């Protein structure tokens, strides 16, 4: 039954996103911009530089500061660069978080990686209340990628 649920389409009509079956991979915007290969529905993160096989990018987890938001889209920045998120009008957000300066987590499906990453949002959460989230994010991502075989 869980498999059937994970294969369903999210509600929202046109542009609905197929919900991922794998947990999201924590990434930085710069990693997607420099090391992503493939295309929509078949993105991979190259790890050839460290002698490892690429990672499938079904869904990603990114964090960043909101630079601008309008009409269900937002532009964010993490420590490695800017990225865009769309489809925000259809995702659960909890507290209002689409305000410039807010630090947020976005889980989404990669739509593009160049010239800058763009995600179709599945979930968004405001992390602004605890500055540790922002200060530790780059280290969390680095640690994860160092330990994935």
From Swiss-Prot:
Where is it located?
Answer: Nucleus
Q: Where is the signal peptide?
A: none
- UniProt entry keywords in alphabetical sequence: DNA replication, DNA-binding, Nucleus, Phosphoprotein
Q: Which Gene3D superfamilies match?
A: Nucleic acid-binding proteins
Q: Which InterPro entries match?
A: NA-bd_OB-fold (IPR012340), RMI2 (IPR032245)
Q: Which GO terms describe its molecular function?
A: DNA binding
Give the record's PTM text: Phosphorylated during mitosis.
Q: List the disulfide bonds.
A: none
One GO CC annotation = nuclear speck
Q: Which residues bind DNA?
A: 46-116
Query: Where Phosphoserine occurs, residue numbers?
Result: 8
Q: Name one Pfam family in it.
A: RMI2
The principal location of this protein is nucleus
| One GO BP annotation of this record | double-strand break repair via homologous recombination
Q: What is the role of this chain?
A: Essential component of the RMI complex, a complex that plays an important role in the processing of homologous recombination intermediates. It is required to regulate sister chromatid segregation and to limit DNA crossover. Essential for the stability, localization, and function of BLM, TOP3A, and complexes containing BLM. In the RMI complex, it is required to target BLM to chromatin and stress-induced nuclear foci and mitotic phosphorylation of BLM.
Describe the family membership recorded for this protein in Swiss-Prot or TrEMBL: Belongs to the RMI2 family.
Q: How does it assemble?
A: Component of the RMI complex, containing at least TOP3A, RMI1 and RMI2. The RMI complex interacts with BLM.
User: What is this protein's record name?
Assistant: RecQ-mediated genome instability protein 2
| Protein encoded by which gene | Rmi2
